[in-house]
UniProtKB/Swiss-Prot annotation:
GO terms for cellular component: small ribosomal subunit. Part of the 30S ribosomal subunit. Contacts protein S5. The interaction surface between S4 and S5 is involved in control of translational fidelity. This is Small ribosomal subunit protein uS4. Keywords: Ribonucleoprotein, Ribosomal protein, RNA-binding, rRNA-binding.
Length: 200
């Protein structure tokens, strides 16, 4: 399944979450798009709930179904709770860390920064959004990209940086200083539904 590249606000309204992180998509019309959006009261099956939860998380991180499932399978090989490990692996993606550092306003924009070669890891350019960032690795903006307007605009509006990452706005350098705890990740996601979905 290809990655969705259409209007994110439509997906946000359909899934009931803000993919931009601003919440603006849901302010005026907090219901699914379509003629019957405001009055839809369709009963959802257990399978439907599981699938909806999967779609929420997949769109939140902007992955294709194949990328999402591969990460899920990788999490299943780790010690600990499958669902929590899955959430943590998603959070450790390079494009997500770039987003968390405030270098991009959305994960989609962060993915573009990585794809276009604007980001380095431990001094080496990495253009793979799915690259798994390890604790202590240094994430930086390439010197040639330091004046990138998109990065500057994002830094102007970004204020919240999670405690599990550190960032120096002067040097445009940050790092993952520890593995995030489940309580610090998306509270609106019930990963148990996703584990159940793939266990069917």
């Amino acid at each position: 399944m290809a990655r969705y590249t259409g209007p994110s606000w439509k997906v946000s309204r359909r899934l009931g979450i803000s993919l931009s992180g601003t919440g603006k998509e849901l302010e005026r019309r907090p219901y699914a798009p379509g003629q019957h959006g405001p009055t839809q009261r369709k009963k959802i099956s257990e399978y439907g709930l599981q699938q909806a939860e999967k779609q929420k998380l997949r769109h939140m991180y902007g992955l294709t179904e194949r990328q999402f499932k591969n990460t899920f399978n990788k999490a299943g090989k780790l010690q600990g709770k499958h669902g929590e490990n899955f959430m943590i692996l998603l959070e450790q993606r390079l494009d997500n860390i770039v987003y968390r550092l405030g270098l991009a306003r959305t994960r989609r924009a962060a993915r573009q920064l990585v794809n276009h070669g604007h980001i380095t890891v431990d001094g080496k350019r990495v253009d793979i959004p799915s690259y798994q960032v390890s604790v202590g690795q240094v994430i930086s903006v390439r010197e040639k990209s330091a004046k990138n307007s998109a990065i500057a605009e994002s830094l102007d509006v970004s204020s919240f940086v999670p405690e599990y990452v550190t960032f120096d706005a002067e040097t445009l350098t940050g790092s993952l200083n520890r593995i995030p705890e489940r309580s610090e990740l998306a509270a609106e996601i019930n990963e148990a539904f996703i584990v159940e979905f793939y266990s069917r």
